[in-house]
Structure formats: structure tokens, C-alpha cells
Amino acid sequence: MALSRRTFSALAGSAALGLALGGSGGPGASSAFAARTVPTGPAPAPPSADGEPHTIGYDRYSLLVDGKRLVVWSGELPPFRLPSPSLWRDVLQKMRAHGYNAVSIYVAWNYHSPAPGRYDFTGVRDLDLFLRTAAETGLYVILRPGPYINAEVDGGGFPGWLTATRGRARSDDPEYLAHVDEWLTQVNRIARKHLFTQGTGTVLLYQIENEYDARVGSAGSRAYMSHLYRKVRADGIDVPLFHNDKGRNGYWTPGSFDTGSERGGWLYGFDGYPSPESTPPDWGTFGPGGAKGGASASPSTPGFVPEFGGGWFDPWGGVFFDGLGYAESRRTRDAAYERRFYLTNLANGLTLHNVYMTFGGTSWGWLPAPVVYTSYDYGAAIDEARQVTDKIAPMHQLGHLLQRVPDFAKLDRAADVRATGLKVYHLTNPDTGAHVYVARNDGDDTVTADLPTAAGDLRISVPARDAKLVAADLSLGPRKLKYASVQPSMRVTAGRQDIAVFTGPKGEMAELLVDCPDEPDVLRLDPEAAWVLDDTGLHVNAPLGQGGLIRVLVEKGERDRPLLLLLADDATAVRLFPYDTPSGTVLVYGPALLRHAEVRGSEVHLSGDIAETTSMEVWGPRGIDTLVWNGRRLPVRVTLSGSLMTTGPLPGVPEVRLPRLGGWRMRRENPEAGPGYDDSGWRTADRKTSFSTTAVPEGQPVLFADDYGFHYGDVWYRGTFDDARGIEEVALGYSTGTQGLLMAWLDGEPLGTHRMPVPDRDTVRKGTWTDTAAFPVREELRSPGRHVLSVLVRRMQHDQDGKADDGHKAARGLTAAVFTGASPKVVWRIRGEGPPDPVRGPLNNGGLHGEREGWHLPGFADRDWEPVDFPVSARYQGVTWYRTTFRLAVPGDVDASVGLTLEDDPYRAYRAQIFLNGWNLGQYINNVGPQHTFVLPNGILRTRGENTLALAVLSEFTTLSGPGTVRLSLLGRALGGTEVSVVPSPGR
């Protein structure tokens, strides 16, 4: 299969397409490239918008880019969860530096569409900018625009307005498809400008739908998938398409639905999220085979896992991680987890590998689905505050290995070998003869065993519940590695020498055997290493982590090109960064991050980050003698290994001082609860029918908020009736997401509050919660005359539609009102959020009075508000607003990540919406948790200027309410960073 723009220039389904693509569309069929053997060779150069056309092909081993094998080592990054476009570059550069060659992104329909026919791809929603930035960074893009994405976002990514439409979602319903086509037209108009096939961008693959496992065998579901396929092709998208199978079902393999006469443009992919306690599964080469065996469902396409767990989400209350939050997700799915599971995947031939998530970000505003709270940190390798964690080490080592050592792109199963106490996978490259062994320890104790290799037994140690990759007969340039007890991490050529890097845990004794037919000169450049030469070759031993990087230089002998061996423990290895320049490869050791490298004559210019005092060492093309770091020329010396090394340490990061938050002012709201409030401008809730999946109770009008155009945040109801005599109780039925809440007033007097329960393990995935709040009516309120029942509902977002049953259409808000003791005739009026903020978008605000009046915005005149000191202790039913300003003065060359931390007595029942410079950055529920610290993204946060902070505190009245302690927290700092543009934050 070879795809190019010209191949797909005609409408998908033409006879010409079928001829051009050959026949890889069904089981057993082969791609166009399969007619000839594609030998092992160097990987393609890092991608860019180079203006040159490219082909994308595949065989059963891997993708083929311009005829060269490509192992896709990708990480998920949702741009909509990082609402500061300057920071996209920061995270993308961190991914590239740490071994990723691709980024996978969902595009959320609800994020871009506030109403039918209205789409916004500007500002924080600038998809074009993200795709340009990815190309400039040198990363392929896997684009996933749905239309359904799931992703733990409101409605699974469906826009709120879709809940009030007739068509059944995720089906071939014509009304639904009309909306879908409109959405895809908008996305594809941007995507087709960034296709790798055209040389105008780096979009490599494109997903349609997601985890679509409902009614798979029906004609309607096949027609739906066929419609999406044809639509995307008709819009000019000519890269391979795929779907992400929920689990290993064998759904939507090539040939399972009609693609017209086109063949070869479809890949099979599946996802997996194994628990840390489970045994890593074999979903490919070593698996059971068949339709439900993972990659074996599509034997003619390469093994593809569009989502493999890089962490896990956490619900309100934190039941998944015992209330400890995402730190516990990161601890239980740590670097050892990654090695056990990801190495098993690679052994099974999964050469298209995307880790979900690599950076999770923040579900800001009303973006989160009911099953998650604000933070979507996920326990990922890069945390929500953009800090690289210990989990990056395996990703860094394996990513650079797969890009820099081509043998790993084409592996066949080899003869079984055994090592006591270990599960061993043995593979070999049919072209080079290299042998690869993945040794996995599923036990609770370290295992030391002899591993049979082609060069003899090799003693290896694998820590408990960990894994190790070792290689034998592996080319290191002109020389060959016979075996090594530690993992190869990369191989580069810098100037006239080859450099091979090997890594392992701190304290492990590394043993290498290098084939040396003629006696070489060996120079031990660091005292930790030892070597001996005998008839079998050069033996090198070194304890990893004893003094940092260990260098051994091998030169002369039969081979005239020197070989530099670099041995590193995990913490050291993540500070080794290769970078390809037009003048040759540069290898940098020392900084926390290398963002960019460029050779200008004899000067090598580097930019990046420093997290602590460090030295720096650079290997590069011949003739370089000057090192420039972040624009500053550094004094260097030339070492015996041929590198440039700084003569003194680079300074660490300056101190970052954060101010104490004070000067608070407060004002209470809820005028809507008062009997004299003017609601004449509100919508009358008088509809009789609804497209919701929730039945309208008999005798009741439709009270569902979505039916009246209110889709996000809080919604108010006012029910007017005459004569309250005899009323003993009012029962209010309502439907919300997780932790939904209702509070009611009669003639301005509080009746009480009702809240949905905290989810447990049995209900954690429940997306719609229904209940009835019954409030007794006090005797003094049972009077004749006009009365107003006021109700505030916090809806807590729409359910996702994972079962393709229109679950996102379940009602939100009130569903019914029933009186005991009398039956007054009630006229209901409803009001929710106002028009969408033109900058912050439709998900930023709900229907609180303060939101409509701009109390959350910078510049609002709050001088007449009451001064207040924290902590606060008050009992009140309803919303109280608190505002303050603060000024930061972070040094200009420092990238500081800042959070807002709220803490209080966990018994107190209240929640707070956090607005920074008008941006709704999350919701804190004091008595539920587990989240206490909220990331304030730079760009929205003015790190060198004034900021406005507003808290909208919703108090339940059942207990005293805060806020308690509210403070700024430093979440990370580095000297360097990227240039951050201010995110527009219009105010009053």
C-alpha cells in the first residue's frame, strides 16, 4: 500500500483507486509494498513540512514511509486540555526530546461548536496552529476527530446542542449524519493543509469514530462507518485511516465494511488498559491468534495499538486510587509497569504504539465527563503541570532505540529460550541476524538467571515486576555487540565516531561483549568501568549510576572508526539527547531538556532547560569548537572522547517567590431565589415532548435544560403558582452527572439541598444519576397568594455515549415537581448560561448570576464588596463570590508552573469554581475530593504581571462553609522554557 495525495485525488471508491492501491483490504491480502522485500535500514528522517510529497505504506511488520521502516512511538496529548497555545510547543518539545516521534490528538466537537452551524478554530481552539507546531517540532500527528471521541469529556465530545436533536447518534440516521458531515468538513478543511503525503505537514494517520462496538454486525453500523470513510476521503484526506477497537474484538478490520473500490487505505487498531496487577498480555506474535487475539485479527497490517494505558482516570471521591489521586496512579503504573507492558507489546509486534496519556492536562470549565474531576493528570509521564516525571525513562530509552537502531522495526519470532524465573520472548531480525530478548519478571522478588544467547549464556538480573530488553549480534556500526546484560538505548554517529548507549537500573553491573577480531585500543575514560580483552572479544563491566555517565572509547584495530560506549543508569540516560541537524547528529548530555540544536559553522547552538546545577557535554560533527546554550557562549574544553565539555557548571534555577493571597472581597448572590425577582426575560418551560432518552413524566412539562438551549454549568428554575395552602411537601425529581446537586427556596426561604452520592466501585462509571429531593414546607410558608419555588441545579455535565444508545441525551436539570397536600398549577421559567464567551468558549460558564454579571472577569468593579479574611466559616445556602488580585514577578528566563491549593476541614460541604482572569479552571468539592491543587496554566496566568482570582463558592447549608486555606503552590521550575504568549482574557 502506498498512499499519496494524487492517489486519493478522485472521490473515494473509483475504479482507479482500487488499481492504484492494490488489494490489502481483506484478510490475507497483501499491500503493494509486500510484492518486494523491504530490507532493514535507517528510519526516515524526522518529519517536517518540507514541501516534498511522501508515500505512506505498510506491511505486516511496520509502516513504510518513503519505503523506509517506521516504528511509531506516540503519546496522547489533548490540546483542548491545555488552554494556552504557547504551552503546546513546550510539551511537544519535551515529547520529541524524550524519544517520541508522534503525537496523537483527539479533536473534540463540543470544544469548537457552540451551536449548529457555528465553529471556532481560533485562540485556544486553533487546530491549525497545533498542527503547525507539531510539524515544526518534528513529530508525526495521529489525528482523531471522531465525531465521537469518548475521552472522558462532556458528552464524549458531542456538542451540547446535539442532545436536543432528533437523529440517533453514532448511526446512519440521516439527521445525525448531516451534523457529522458539517463537523468533519470543518476539521478536514484544516487537516488537509497538514498532510504528510503532501509535504505540507506531518499528519500521518487519521481515525474515524472511536471504540464503536455497538451493533457491529448490523447493516446500519456498516453503512455508518462507510459513510465516514467516504466523507473523509472526499474531503481530500489521503493518509491511512483506522478505527480504535475497544479491546480485542476484531471489529472493523480491513474488508469489514464497504470502502468502495478502494483497498489498502485502512488499518486495524485496538486499545488496552491492563491493570498493574495483571500479567502483561500477548496481543500479537506470541498470542493465541484469531479475530480476538489483537494484532492477529488483521495479519496483513502491522500491529497497531492506538491507545495503551499510560495511567488511568480518577473519579470524584477518588475511589480508583483510595483517595490519593493521580500520584497513586503514577505510583502503581510506574516506569517498571511501562517496561513490563510496553516491552511485551513490542515483542508482540505492536510497532504502532500510542500511550494514552503522555500528557493529560486539565478538564477545565465544564469540559469533564461525569466520571472525572477537573484534573486529567492521568498519572502520565508528563504531569498536569508539564513536569517530566520518573515515568519518562522507559519512554526515552525505548523511543530513541526504536528510531536509532533499525533492527527493531522488523522482527520475527525465534526459537524459544528459557531463563529460570523469567518469561522470555526471543525474536530475530531476518535481514541483520540481530537477536532481541525481552525478559519479564512477574514475581515479587528480583530474579537473576542465565539467558541463553547466540554468543553464550548471559547472566541478567530483572527486578521484581519489571522487564528488560537485551540484544545480541547487534550492529554498533563496523563493530558488533555480541551481547549486553543491559538495554541498548541508542546508536548514533557523531563526526567520525559511532556512539552506542546502554542503560539499566541504578546499581546494576553492566556487562557488554563486543566483537573485536583485531586487538583495539581501549581507553577507560571514567574510573568506574573495567575491561578485558580475550578470545571472545572485548568485555566491558561497569556499575551503573556510580558517578553519572560512564565512557569507554574503543578505537583502532581492524575498524578505523572509533566506537564510544556510554553506560548510564535511568536517571542519567534521560539527560542524553540526540538531535539530527543538516550538518549531522548532535548528542548532548547534561541538561534537563534539549529543545533544539543547530550547527553554524564551528558553533553548535543549543536551547533547552536546566533544572539544577549541571555541566554539559556535546558530541557533534567534525570541526565544532564552540558551544552556545540559550544564546550564551560557554567556555569548553575538548575531551578524549571527542566531545566539547563545559569547564564549569551551569547555574541552577533562580528562586521563585510566590505571594500570599490576601485582600479578598466577597458578595453573596442568588437574587433568583427572591419572590420579587424579575424573570420575565426567562424561557417558559412549556414543551410537551423531547428528544431526550429520559421520559417526560406524565402531567409534567419538559423541564430538561438542554431542550431550552442551556447545556453547561448551573441552571435556574422559577416555578410560579397561586395559593400554597395545604402544601406539606415538594418533591423535585432531577437528573445530573456525578456529584450533581439541587437546592431549593420557596419565596426566598431555603428549603434545603440535595446532592447525588459519591460514587463507589460499583457506580464509578455511572454517567447519569437520578433522584428525588423531598423538602417539607414549613407552616408559615403555606399561605394564599402568589408564590415562587426557585431551584438551582448543578448539572455536572452530560454522560458519554459509549454504548451508542444516545446516553448523552439523558436529561439534565429538573425532571418533575410533585406537591403533597395540594396540587397547584405551576408555570415554570428556566435560565442557564448566557451567550458563549467569544474568547473562552461555550464550556467556560454556566448560569450563575455572578457569571452573567461578570463577577469572574478581570476589571470588574468590586470596590463596594465586603472585605474578608480567609479562612471563612459561614453557613449559607447558595453562592458566595470571593475576589482578589495578585502580582507575580517570575524571572523572564524561568519557566515556573504554579497551582492554586485549597484546603479545609473535609466535613464542610461546599464546592468552589475557580476563575483565573475570567477562565474557569476547575471545580473543587471540599467534602468529596480528592483534588486540592489546580494547575494555573502560564499564558492564562500572567507570570510577570497582575492576575484576578475569583472563587464562586456554592454552600450546601448542611454544614459550615469555607473557603479555608487558599494559597499559590510552586509545582515546578526550570531555567529555559519556551516563549509564552498571553492568552487573551477580556474583562469588564
Residue ranges and their predicted role:
Residues 117-123, 149-170, 260, 371-373:
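Aromatic- and acidic-residue-enriched segments that line the glycan-binding/catalytic groove
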Residues 88-98, 104-153:
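Aromatic-lined substrate-binding rim segments of carbohydrate-active enzymes
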Residues 7-28:
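N-terminal export signals
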Residues 179-248:
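Active-site neighborhood of glycoside hydrolase catalytic domains
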Residues 223, 246-287, 364-367:
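Substrate-binding cleft/loops of secretory-pathway carbohydrate-active enzymes
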Residues 392-941, 948, 954-988:
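Non-catalytic C-terminal accessory domains or segments of carbohydrate-active enzymes
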Residues 35-101:
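N-terminal carbohydrate-binding accessory modules
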Residues 277-367:
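Catalytic-core region of carbohydrate-active enzymes that cleave or remodel glycosidic bonds
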